[in-house]
UniProtKB/Swiss-Prot annotation:
Gene3D superfamilies: Nucleoside Triphosphate Pyrophosphohydrolase. A motif (Nudix box) lies at residues 38-59. This is RNA pyrophosphohydrolase. Its EC number is 3.6.1.-. Pfam families: NUDIX (PF00293). SUPFAM superfamilies: Nudix (SSF55811).
Amino acid sequence: MIDGDGYRLNVGIVICNNHGQVFWAKRYGQHSWQFPQGGIDEGETPEQAMFRELYEEVGLTKKDVKIIATSRHWLRYKLPKRLVRWDSKPVCIGQKQKWFLLRLECDESRINMQRGKSPEFDGWRWVSYWYPVRQVVSFKRDVYRRAMKEFASLAMPFRERKTKGKRKKQRR
């Protein structure tokens, strides 16, 4: 769905593990990496779209994750002019995204990027929380920064919950 301003309605997905790391996926056949994301179909809620995309792109289901947070606002980015398909109607000039922070509740061996009709990703890894903001393609960087900033206080405690009650040396 494309809104009246030319933005495709979309969801972005940040998956955290219990170590405060985030799931980072390599685009199929490319050298670029990103979070899972995808369009919202007609009649679908953002949450329904998120679970559909999560399964299609990562192979995970509702029971494999827990929703920790949803972005308060829609976050938008414009596509570079060279990526706009001017001959499509309506013309899509960018993405308008609702972001979800999920915690992985299953073993990571359940991740399977081959479940969708045409795989979006061909590799993945866990990275430090802020790594994606520095590494994502430049036109998505501000949206990533805003989503990650909004979720930071909720994502970081995953690490502390595992070690609660144990003294841990501070790393510097």
